């Protein structure tokens, strides 16, 4: 440019005006020519830093100009630029990048997520909303952390991820996962509603967790009211991965893990068992069992079975998935195929195997959007077997060491006990579960098709139809066998039970939405009509009478019986929602839903759900001066009413047996009798929730914090009310709306992300507190008793209710001076006379602690440096008590096996102990429900830890990303609990939630995995 300037001065000084003008033109042409010669073509590929996948539609702008281009479906671009230019790469939800051209002709860019933005879109009921605009309580799951939980059930992924959400699971392959949101809201069903891609499902059990894109938890009435009667226990919304316009991308993930029981019990070996059991017999005035008497010829000295060593082995877990994604704007696709298998860590055929496929298609043509979803799952589960309600784990721990695992002389080939030799009733769990076949097969097909058309600007109509079909076959064959004197199955008892059936659910959603922006005002409205139908069919057959080795088919049984049942449930709902925002400062939302269901009688089959919520973004107010490091302050609150309709079909119709007979003067006369007396006025349970919260964003929103308080009042709860025996009903009670309870608590969550340096890290944590109080039980307030628990008005649901101990009777004088304690002897437990009436009775039982954790928490830590990354997920709960029934059984001093603690039992020469004398029959009931077996349920776990390494791949390789990782689960448990795991899954999640009767312990799992993107 300096040369041209001098040329201009020279021409102006020496040449006439015409010649000077000609010189100017020549100079301009030269300048243009020089400029053209300085431009260059810059090309490159833009990818997502998160998954290394091409990013189509990214804008590339030359700074300070209008020159712009976009990336194609493969993420490629080309643009003319000068060395002095700066390219700006930008795209929605990604942080913009500026790169100087200089001499570069190829510039590849990896765009990072814009972590400072609060414009993340979250899925809510029948729609989406910006996270910053939420006025209700919606917990967003950190999927990067949640997906590192190796599991067959997506519900397990929620554990510790969202404040106020508690999850209980077990180590049984394919076992049930128990999830609660903000405590217990009902005496019956407390399970939340699951919605997958807009489809209502009972649970996500049949769906591959690896195919999930996002998960949101709707916790308050404002967010869940749009689901009406189903939303009372909270809603979990799951969105699976959708197709993205672009070239075909293939992802493969493979994982193989090894599972072992994390903790074993200390139980007695042969000598310890024989010592304690012999003492128990002598204390009861009995002779020593021949098998335990060294002076008897039947004394057992050659069998010393450690049943835990015999049963526990290394279980295997496998998970392989293959996903395809790509397409065009007209039709994009995502298909995921997933295989999962888990063999048990107990030596038995029990395992769980599942094959699933999910296909999502979506596209857009002008004003018309459309899509479909097709999913299929086939699963096979071999179930564990228990005897008369005793769990397999409880039976395993109680198995005596003088019983062999195998015995070729017994029918079936497995060992057992002998009544005359050992006198013990002890189940060979290994033999029991290898002889019995208990299989469940499931085939599930789901389909969904939808279309959305924009009628005029802002006004859209959407039609959504879905279909869900489950077919199942359950078979249980109990063959003729001999597992000891108490567990002999004769030919007449050998049986085959077969249950086949199907469940079909159809939904039709008609939705109309409208959006309008007028200056600072924004309106969003939703109106809809929802129809549904559920059909259930079951056919069962039973065959009895099989010879040993006979084919387990119904036609070979000596006798057969069969039956079937069929049920249909229909429902119609009307929904509406309105959102209003003024100047991005004041937010308001209202929801309304009316449900009508055939579950209730005609007079009570309709109910209304509604909610109101509002938010104030203080940080957007001009009159509030905030420090620079404070970016966001928002206050929000909500109130709403929901319902609960989880009752059986025809629950309002009394059942009559018209084939009953009555005995009159020794003659049978025909007649009728009431089978079940039901309330024709039974109605919906009600749930009202109030919620207030404060949200903060600091340091460019890298640090975010939320504090929340809620009160949830449940009324009209279904509960059994006693009936006079004159009604003829059995049981003599009727279930009606006569219960109420309250849950309240605080919830806190915080997160911090730092991605500005070579070492990137993030920290997130959540804490939830909960207080449960029962307000009403029936008409007269009669308490409800569970296993070692009592539910009473004014207290928490399912509190432990037991006796208190006061040492051991050391001599006859102490025994005589104590309150009357029937059948007590020296060496027995002394119980406290709580009511002071001079005798020990049921009236002396007291509440010993709540079983619902007072607090639960979770913490995610993750970091990455260059190609390495590491993450840890800690989770815990506390403030609750656990009744350790397994420990009670092992401390009973009877014929079953014992805890090693029993070796320190009381004797006249060993009085400095708190372990009572063993005595057969336990006349003093030393093993009754008491604080001897109540323990703190507090724990903290290293639930997941993963270390990954991203293998460098050439830019020209067809492999876009390759990663190796090592994953560990349940690696460390910090707890004082004696049992295998304080995080157990109780069969009864309500009245006996804190009763550990032998749930399958969660195993310690170490997995090796590979991820490859093509």
Per-range role (PLM):
Residues 254, 339-341, 588-597, 639:
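Transmembrane beta-strand segments that form the barrel wall of outer-membrane beta-barrel proteins
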Residues 1-358, 362-371, 446-447, 684, ...:
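Short, small/polar-rich motifs associated with maturation and membrane association
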Residues 212, 357-359, 508, 572-578, ...:
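Extended, hydrophobic alpha-helical segments in both membrane/secreted and soluble proteins
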Residues 240, 269, 322-326, 357-363, ...:
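Residues on the lipid-exposed face of transmembrane beta-strands in outer-membrane beta-barrel proteins
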Residues 23, 323, 362, 762, ...:
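Conserved C-terminal beta-signal and adjacent last beta-strands/turns
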Residues 46, 111, 200, 374, ...:
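Hydrophobic beta-strand positions in extracellular immunoglobulin-like domains
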């Amino acid at each position: 440019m300096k040369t041209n300037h001098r040329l201009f001065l020279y021409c102006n000084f020496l040449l006439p005006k015409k010649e000077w003008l000609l010189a100017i033109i020549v100079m301009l042409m030269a300048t243009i020519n020089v400029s053209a010669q300085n431009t260059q073509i810059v090309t490159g590929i833009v990818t997502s830093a998160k998954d290394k996948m091409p990013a189509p539609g990214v804008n590339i702008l030359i700074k300070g100009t209008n020159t712009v281009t976009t990336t194609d479906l493969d993420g490629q671009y080309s643009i003319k630029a000068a060395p002095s230019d700066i390219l700006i790469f930008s795209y929605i939800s990604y942080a913009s990048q500026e790169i100087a051209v200089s001499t570069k002709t190829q510039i590849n860019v990896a765009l990072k997520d814009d972590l400072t933005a609060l414009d993340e879109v979250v899925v809510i009921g029948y729609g989406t909303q910006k996270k910053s605009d939420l006025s209700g309580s919606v917990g967003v799951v950190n999927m990067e952390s949640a997906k590192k939980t190796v599991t067959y059930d997506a519900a397990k992924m929620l554990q510790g991820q969202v404040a106020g959400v508690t999850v209980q699971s077990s180590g049984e392959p394919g076992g049930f996962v128990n999830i609660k949101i903000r405590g217990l809201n009902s005496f019956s069903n407390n399970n939340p509603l699951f919605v997958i891609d807009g489809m209502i499902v009972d649970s996500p059990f049949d769906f591959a967790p690896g195919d999930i894109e996002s998960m949101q938890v709707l916790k308050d009435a404002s967010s869940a009211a749009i689901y009406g009667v189903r939303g009372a226990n909270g809603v979990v919304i799951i969105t699976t991965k959708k197709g993205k316009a672009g070239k075909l991308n293939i992802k493969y993930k493979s994982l193989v893990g090894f599972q072992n029981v994390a903790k074993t019990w200390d139980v007695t070996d042969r000598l310890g068992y024989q010592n304690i059991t012999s003492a128990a017999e002598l204390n009861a005035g009995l002779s020593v069992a021949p098998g335990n008497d060294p002076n008897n010829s039947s004394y057992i000295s050659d069998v010393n079975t450690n049943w835990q060593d015999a049963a526990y082995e290394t279980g295997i877990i496998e998970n392989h998935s293959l996903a395809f994604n790509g397409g065009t704007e007209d039709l994009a696709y995502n298909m995921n195929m997933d295989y999962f298998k888990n063999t048990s860590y107990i030596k038995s055929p029990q395992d769980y195997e599942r094959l699933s496929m999910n296909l999502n298609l979506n596209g857009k043509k002008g004003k018309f959007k459309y899509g479909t979803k097709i999913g299929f799952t086939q699963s096979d589960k071999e179930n564990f077997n228990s005897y008369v309600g005793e769990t397999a784990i409880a039976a395993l721990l109680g198995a005596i060491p003088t019983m062999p695992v195998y015995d070729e002389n017994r029918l079936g080939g497995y060992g057992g006990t002998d009544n005359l030799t050992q006198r013990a009733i002890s189940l060979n769990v290994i033999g029991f579960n290898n002889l019995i076949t208990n299989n469940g097969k499931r085939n599930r097909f789901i389909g969904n098709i939808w279309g959305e058309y924009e009628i005029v600007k802002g006004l859209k109509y959407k039609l959504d139809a879905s279909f869900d079909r489950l077919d199942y076959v359950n078979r249980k064959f109990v063959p003729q066998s001999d597992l000891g004197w108490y567990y002999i199955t004769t030919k007449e008892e050998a049986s085959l039970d077969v249950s086949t059936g199907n469940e079909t659910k159809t939904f039709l959603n008609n939705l109309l939405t409208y959006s309008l922006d007028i200056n600072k005002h924004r309106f969003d409205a939703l109106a809809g009509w929802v129809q549904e139908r559920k059909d259930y069919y079951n056919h069962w057959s039973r065959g009895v009478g099989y010879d040993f080795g006979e084919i387990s088919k119904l036609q070979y049984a000596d006798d057969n019986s069969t039956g079937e049942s069929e049920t249909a449930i229909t429902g119609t709902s009307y929904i509406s929602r309105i959102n209003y925002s003024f100047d991005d400062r004041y937010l308001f939302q209202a929801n309304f839903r009316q449900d009508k269901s055939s579950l209730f009688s005609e007079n009570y089959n309709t109910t209304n759900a509604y909610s109101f919520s509002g938010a104030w973004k203080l940080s957007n107010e001009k009159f509030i001066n905030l420090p620079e490091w404070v970016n966001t302050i928002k206050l929000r609150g909500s109130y709403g009413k929901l319902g609960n309709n989880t009752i059986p079909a025809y629950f309002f119709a009394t059942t009559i047996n018209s084939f009953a007979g009555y005995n009159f003067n020794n003659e049978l006369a025909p007649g009728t009798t009431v089978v079940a007396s039901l309330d024709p006025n039974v109605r919906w349970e009600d749930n009202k929730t109030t919620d207030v919260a404060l949200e903060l964003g600091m340091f460019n929103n890298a640090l975010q914090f939320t504090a929340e308080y809620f009160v949830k009042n449940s009324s009209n709860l279904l509960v059994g009310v006693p009936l006079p025996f004159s009604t003829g009903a059995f049981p003599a009670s009727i279930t009606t709306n006569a219960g109420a309870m309250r849950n309240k608590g605080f919830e806190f969550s915080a997160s911090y992300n730092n991605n500005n340096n070579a070492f990137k890290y993030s920290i997130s944590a959540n804490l939830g507190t909960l207080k449960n109080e029962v307000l009403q039980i029936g008409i007269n307030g009669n308490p409800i008793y569970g296993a070692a628990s009592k539910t009473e008005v004014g207290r928490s649901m399912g509190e432990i209710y037991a006796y208190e101990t006061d040492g051991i009777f050391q001599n006859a004088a102490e025994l005589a001076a104590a309150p009357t304690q029937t059948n007590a002897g020296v060496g027995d437990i002394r119980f406290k006379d709580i009511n002071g009436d001079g005798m020990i009775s049921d009236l002396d039982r007291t509440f010993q602690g709540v079983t619902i954790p007072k607090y639960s928490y979770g913490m995610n830590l993750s970091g990455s440096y260059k190609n390495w990354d590491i993450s840890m997920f800690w989770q815990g709960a506390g403030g609750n008590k656990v009744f350790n029934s397994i420990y009670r059984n092992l401390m009973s001093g009877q014929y079953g096996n014992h805890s090693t603690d029993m070796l320190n039992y009381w004797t006249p020469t060993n009085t400095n102990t708190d372990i009572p004398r063993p005595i057969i029959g336990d006349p003093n009931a030393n093993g009754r429900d008491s604080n001897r077996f109540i323990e703190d349920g507090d724990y903290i776990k290293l639930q997941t830890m993963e270390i990954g390494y991203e293998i460098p791949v050439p830019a020209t390789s067809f492999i876009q990303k390759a990663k190796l990782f090592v994953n560990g689960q349940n690696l460390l448990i910090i707890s004082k609990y004696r049992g295998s795991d304080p995080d157990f899954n109780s069969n009864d999640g309500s009245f006996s939630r804190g009763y550990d009767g032998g749930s399958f312990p969660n195993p310690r799992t170490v997995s090796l995995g590979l991820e490859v993107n093509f």
